[in-house]
Swiss-Prot record:
Pathway annotation from the record: Purine metabolism; IMP biosynthesis via de novo pathway; 5-formamido-1-(5-phospho-D-ribosyl)imidazole-4-carboxamide from 5-amino-1-(5-phospho-D-ribosyl)imidazole-4-carboxamide (10-formyl THF route): step 1/1; Purine metabolism; IMP biosynthesis via de novo pathway; IMP from 5-formamido-1-(5-phospho-D-ribosyl)imidazole-4-carboxamide: step 1/1
UniProt GO MF annotations: IMP cyclohydrolase activity; phosphoribosylaminoimidazolecarboxamide formyltransferase activity
Gene from which this protein is expressed: purH
Name this polypeptide is given: Bifunctional purine biosynthesis protein PurH
Taxonomic path: Bacteria, Pseudomonadati, Myxococcota, Myxococcia, Myxococcales
Gene3D superfamilies: 3.40.140.20, Methylglyoxal synthase-like domain
Residue span(s) of domain MGS-like: 1-144
Species of the source: Anaeromyxobacter sp. (strain K)
One annotated GO biological process: 'de novo' IMP biosynthetic process
Keyword line: Hydrolase, Multifunctional enzyme, Purine biosynthesis, Transferase
Length: 524
């Protein structure tokens, strides 16, 4: 039978109705600080923990519930003779239900509060009570989520106690709650540079907090279950995870992956640009005078693959752009915004998912990345691979001309465009670019020469006179020879092959230009 409950919550959602239902069952309520005040003002009978323990709060409220009469009442094992003797000797009544959620530490961090303020929001007594109650779940219920108030109240009203199954369910939630809380603290401190020294680039222990945003219909395939988890803090750069979904069907696992690929690609450009993604790799990229023109030019690169694609634009969508978008079946569009006319035009495509990421419209120089946002995580069974995100870029001055002929001004422009795109194509990656757009893309092949052949074979536009980007060096001259045969006139690649001399000789023989970046962009 539940006779006594300790209630101390920061999130007071649903608190008073829940407490009233407990009080109506004859449950004695113990409470502290703001929770006690809220209950008393609502007319709910409540006993202050200080009165209960005869030990007033000290240290400005830092010590309230850390007392044997509290934790003894929570932790004692009913029916165990030695525990029964201890609580009897010390006059410690049982506490059968603990209702606690923790100080808003994550909210303080998200609000950008000073370090000292965030530290004060690290809860001590709350997690201790939650863990004590969860450990003793054979006898005690612990509620950390207001969403469980109805379930707990209804069961107590029906049976005056909580079943073993309910207590176990609550125990699991409680330990997940405190684990996430501690991980948030660790993540915050890991990302913060200590006054005396910078932190290790990769910490010895990696703690990260993600909360389930929603279940997905399935994972990559229908036989795989899936869910989407969101970080505690919104990044200061454009983010699919925090974008607003304005219309369309629910997002799928594959939609989210493809949207991220599209967003990452379009974020390379200051100019008005469009990226079209299919199966997590670009099938068309272009800049334009308007967003609509950028989309139309990108679509022309590979109109077959663009069907059913995912589109990212770095400028707001107007009616003219919306008209272009509705000319093709698309799965998703992400952009900084949509005007009213565009929304009306796109509304006819009821299944088209529209996402709005306002920060995408801001100047790239204004985006900031916290240390944890500069990392990329991928799991393997039994482990986690962690690396810096590939945010590398090059300027013209970073490149070394490898051939006798240097690129022309137009070739330089096309080369740097191709280099921005090729880092987002699955390796081995080849991109033909001309006049600020891709004209052919080949990727995902197990040899570089085959990626060149694939790009040329799939090209819907004329590749003659284009410039080519390669995500890694050419191990043999065959890839360069195929590029020459296709009619391209310049190449940008990392360089560094054992056969660089052979590759350069092939380029010089054909009179094409080649530059080395010294930077590789493998993508697996």
């Amino acid at each position: 039978m539940t006779r006594r409950a300790l209630v101390s919550v920061s999130d007071k959602t649903g608190l008073v109705p829940f407490a009233r239902r407990l009080a109506a069952l004859g449950v004695e309520l113990l409470s502290t600080g703001g929770t006690q005040k809220t209950l008393a003002e609502a007319g709910v009978p409540v006993v202050g923990v200080g009165d209960y323990t005869q030990a007033p709060e000290i240290l400005g409220g830092r010590v309230k519930t850390l007392h044997p009469r509290v934790h003894g009442g929570i932790l004692y094992r009913r029916g165990l003779a030695s525990d029964e003797a201890d609580v009897k000797a010390r006059d410690i009544p049982p506490i059968d239900l603990v209702v606690v959620n923790l100080y808003p530490f994550r909210e303080a961090v998200a609000a950008g509060k000073p370090f000292e303020t965030c530290v004060e929001e690290i809860d001590i007594g709350g997690p201790t009570m939650v863990r004590s109650a969860a450990k003793n779940s054979a006898h005690v219920g612990v509620v950390v989520d207001p969403a469980d108030y109805e379930k707990v109240a209804a069961e107590l009203e029906a049976t005056r106690t909580l079943s073993a199954a309910t207590r176990f369910y609550l125990m699991k939630k409680a330990f997940a709650h405190t684990a996430a809380y501690d991980a948030a603290i660790s993540e915050y401190l890991t990302a913060r540079e200590a006054p005396e020294a910078a932190p290790a680039h990769f910490p010895a222990t990696l703690a990260a907090v993600y909360t389930k945003a929603y279940d997905l219909r399935y994972g990559e395939n229908p036989h795989q279950a899936g869910a989407f988890y969101r970080a505690a803090r919104e990044p200061e750069e454009p983010s699919v995870a925090f974008a607003d979904v304005l219309q369309g069907k629910e997002l799928s696992y594959n939609n989210l992956l493809d949207l991220q690929a599209a967003l990452a690609g379009v974020m390379e450009f200051d100019e008005t640009a469009c990226v079209i993604i299919k199966h997590n790799t670009p099938c068309g990229v272009s800049t334009g005078r308007t967003a609509g023109e950028a989309f139309a030019r990108a679509r022309e690169c590979d109109p077959v693959s663009a069907f059913g694609g995912i589109v990212a634009l770095n400028r707001p969508v107007d009616e003219a752009t919306a008209s272009e978008l509705t000319s093709l079946f698309l799965e998703c569009v992400i952009a900084p915004g949509y005007d009213a006319a565009a929304r009306a035009a796109l509304a006819v495509k009821k299944n088209l998912r529209l996402l709005e990421a306002p920060r995408l419209g801001a100047a790239r120089a204004t985006w900031r990345r916290r240390p944890e946002e500069g990392r990329e995580l991928r799991s393997i069974p039994g482990g986690l691979l962690v690396m810096d995100r590939d945010l590398g870029s090059v300027r013209r001055d970073d490149c070394k001309v490898m051939t006798k002929r240097a690129p022309t001004e137009q070739e330089w422009k096309d080369l740097l465009f191709a280099w921005k795109v090729v880092k987002h194509v699955k390796s081995n990656a080849i991109v033909f670019a001309k006049d600020d757009r891709t004209v052919a893309i080949g990727g995902g092949q197990t040899s570089r020469v085959e990626s060149v052949k694939t790009a040329v074979m799939k090209a819907a536009l004329d590749v003659r006179g284009s410039s080519v980007g390669s995500d890694a060096f050419f191990p043999f001259a065959d890839g360069v020879e195929e590029i020459i045969k296709a009619g391209a006139t310049a190449i940008i690649q990392p360089g560094g092959s054992m056969r660089d001399a052979e590759v350069i000789a092939a380029a010089d023989k054909a009179g094409i230009a080649m530059v080395a970046t010294g930077m590789r962009h493998f993508r697996h």
